[in-house]
Curated annotation (Swiss-Prot):
Protein name as annotated: Staphyloferrin A transporter
Pfam families (alphabetical): MFS_3
Source species: Staphylococcus aureus (strain NCTC 8325 / PS 47)
Transit peptide as UniProt keyword: no
Origin: domain of life: Bacteria
Membrane topology term: Multi-pass membrane protein
InterPro entries assigned to the protein according to its UniProt record, in alphabetical order: MFS_dom (IPR020846), MFS_trans_sf (IPR036259), TM_effector (IPR010290)
């Protein structure tokens, strides 16, 4: 079952990247309006924030394999319709693109927590850490090759062909999902009465350590993870006129992420999960500071480390919550945890304003320092709470 799930995931994520690049290019070249591009991407992302909790509740109630087939089949259907429309008509209304982006956003909002909830149940032969790490590895591989494939398609053919490639990826992904079946987790009667939001509030009341990790993640997603938006500005400032530097930098970042997912399961045998999360977040902040040096070798090394440590932080975050949640609450809790990604666009906006006011080099320094400070503050808060809990338990015993 593992091979079918990960093969399907690879094709789904590959299709997502090819389609995303193709859609952005289609909107820009067809309508020549940057506002339309912003609206389309807003419609694609906002359902994730609005529907994730509801989607997580669904993942806890029904056969996850069937839900996965439904979501990917629906993605194939709407993408195939868009493909037919763009091939059939020389111009289509922007409203059609907005409707498509919204539908894909809704399906993504359901599929993301669902996929995370499946990982611990894949196989007895691999641990949750290995499953999450390999899942992240696939995401990073697709992030590396997806845009490149889309670029080749756009150069040789045109944007509608990227939608065709996307639909083909989805279709094969659906076929690979056919053997996937998972037992529905039995929800206790007293737990089934509670609304999803109450379950999440009660979870964070009980798990103080998890609460600190989640808050840390929300903040550093805004301060540090917006680097992808600002990196082209930095490379153009430090190395003006050398556009290839940005492409190489993004490749190095992806390589760092791939290395991180491969070695993390081994590293976690020697370093505790929580300590690993805070350590990788701290080193991520240090790496952000390193990219401001006007030295191409140092920049590429630091970019690689950014990819490595940021992926370590994200993966240990996901693994921690996978290992510290009840089976029948996994979908609900993970749906909230995955919403930390919603802080990246907000952080990008804030850091873009900082770049206009203070300059791009100082902005990266601000990003690095703020990420380091946030990590250290919440690490010591978490440590203090842990010591208090140990003292109280010792007093009781």
């Amino acid at each position: 079952m593992t091979k079918y799930f990960f093969s399907s995931s690879f094709l789904l994520f590959l299709g997502n990247w090819i389609g995303q690049i193709g859609l952005n290019w289609f909107v820009l070249t067809t309508y020549h309006n940057a506002v339309y591009l912003g609206i389309v991407n807003f419609c694609r992302l906002v359902p994730i924030l609005l529907l994730s909790v509801w989607a997580g509740a669904i993942a806890d109630k029904y056969d996850k394999g069937r839900l996965l087939r439904i979501t990917i089949s629906s993605s194939f259907l709407v993408t195939a319709i868009l493909c037919v429309l763009t091939y059939s008509f020389t111009a289509i209304p922007i409203s059609v693109i907005i409707i498509y982006a919204t539908l894909r956003g809704i399906l993504s909002a359901v599929e993301t927590p669902l996929r995370q909830a499946i990982l611990p149940d894949l196989s007895d032969k691999i641990s949750t850490t290995q499953a999450v790490s390999f899942h992240s590895f696939i995401i990073n591989i697709c992030r590396s090759i997806g845009p490149a494939i889309a670029g080749v398609i756009l150069a040789v053919y045109h944007a509608p062909t990227t939608f065709l490639a996307q639909a083909i990826c989805y279709f094969i992904a659906v076929l690979l999902c056919l053997p996937l079946h998972f037992k529905v987790t039995k929800i206790p009667e007293d737990a089934s009465r509670y609304m999803p939001l109450k379950v999440i509030i009660d979870y964070f009341k009980l798990h103080m350590e998890g609460r600190q990790i989640f808050i840390t993640s929300l903040l550093i997603m805004a301060t540090g993870f917006s680097y992808t938006t600002l990196l082209p500005v930095l490379t153009n400032k430090v190395f003006p006129g050398k556009s290839e530097i940005f492409g190489i930098a993004m490749t190095m970042c992806a390589i760092g992420g791939i290395i991180a997912t491969l070695v993390l399961p081994k590293v976690l045998k020697y370093i505790g999960m929580v300590n690993m999360y805070y350590l990788s977040s701290f080193l991520f902040g240090i790496a952000l500071l390193g990219v401001v040096f006007h030295n191409i070798v140092i920049m590429f090394i630091c970019i690689t480390l950014i990819g490595l440590f940021s992926q370590w932080a994200r993966t240990t975050n996901r693994v921690y919550f996978q290992n510290n949640v009840k089976d029948y609450e996994r979908g609900k809790v993970l749906s909230i945890i995955m919403m930390d990604r919603g802080m990246i666009p907000l952080g990008s906006l804030l850091m873009s304003i900082c770049a206009d006011v203070f300059g791009i080099v100082r902005t990266f320094s601000i990003m690095g320092i703020s990420t380091i400070c946030i990590t250290m503050v919440f690490y010591f808060i978490n440590r203090k709470l842990k010591l208090k809990l140990e003292e109280s338990n010792h007093g009781i015993s």
